[in-house]
């Protein structure tokens, strides 16, 4: 160290003054400490293999990096960021040869590599909890395939459905959200190393080698693109925001259902009032719902930071990264909680079935039955609307018969078998009749659950394979490092 606490590296220019703390990112850099060590090790191994630096210098640097790791992030010397602080620690330990660590490299490609390295791990964690939520929804669907409940549009009773059909609706959206996260992961898992500041390097580096040592799928081809672009952050945060928006709808439904007595939220995921001891509040799902605002806010903040930036590197990018961490942490936590709520919720079948018949919610099914008997659907619609108007709730066979005769001039039996209308008036019968693909009938639900579980199995297998691939790369890097130290 030099007098006054200046870092060893880059100490000759612009090292002091009030801007020092403003420029520093050390407060948030603990998150990428391990990533930077891995990136440093892969870079040093590659430099030695390419004869850019000697084996002795490589061994000394790698040994110093091991000491830095053992001491931990909090033991780092002062620095503008974790990258500079680690290099300073290496130079202090090794001497001048420690400065060879940064050969053929800029902080620009180094920082980008560290962000990608850490973000990909976070994305895998996010994918894992989203798949777990889908699995919980599939389990609910399988268990509640015949549990009839009211379905709503505009929060008004619309048509009878089932708990299973409701659960599967979210499982489907979350499957697409999983795909978006996987797409973001694929474009995150590319190496920018070797780009240097933005225009490459005169040294004979092997970009593919460092990419392989770090488990990246390949390299970002153009050096300026590799060093300067943060579109992978925007894609990841956008995918996370989509997950959060999906879960906000799920959470809103659970809060609404709890208010109506349609679902029993486990005590583990509820709270009571500080003054009203009888209260059981679904607070966790209210916070899950609010997470969408945080995630979309991070998305907007990130996009605003990135818009209009000229090529190649701009310090604005330092402020961009935190928005990604905010989104991935908040969304992952919220999805994990949502999965727990879904997995432990109780569904009171008798109460749900009774509520399913309220508000003449079987009206559409009755109109369908009349249309199946030969009435034009619009005429059938008029009949049922009149039955609802005359009968208030309207859910009686007599009301439908009277309305049919009033509109058509014929008795109900001349249009359709009254038994068909009676079945359509019954919430259970109404659900059973809607057996088209994707519908709520038990047979349709059974097929849908099988498809959903096939998708879950495929995504779980892909996730396990990707984690194994990264673990293999980490083992391979450790083996290469052990050849020097």
From Swiss-Prot:
One of its GO terms (cellular component) is cytosol. Keywords: Amino-acid biosynthesis, Arginine biosynthesis, Cytoplasm, Lyase. It is an enzyme of class 4 (lyase). One of its GO terms (biological process) is L-arginine biosynthetic process. Pfam families: ASL_C2, Lyase_1. SUPFAM superfamilies: L-aspartase-like. One of its GO terms (molecular function) is argininosuccinate lyase activity. Pathway: Amino-acid biosynthesis; L-arginine biosynthesis; L-arginine from L-ornithine and carbamoyl phosphate: step 3/3. Transmembrane segments: none annotated. It is found in: Cytoplasm. It catalyses: 2-(N(omega)-L-arginino)succinate = fumarate + L-arginine. Its EC number is 4.3.2.1. Its main location: cytoplasm. It comes from the Archaea. The keyword Amino-acid biosynthesis applies. Coiled coil: none annotated. Belongs to the lyase 1 family. Argininosuccinate lyase subfamily. NCBIfam families: argH. HAMAP family: Arg_succ_lyase. This is Argininosuccinate lyase. It comes from Halobacterium salinarum (strain ATCC 700922 / JCM 11081 / NRC-1) (Halobacterium halobium). The gene is argH.
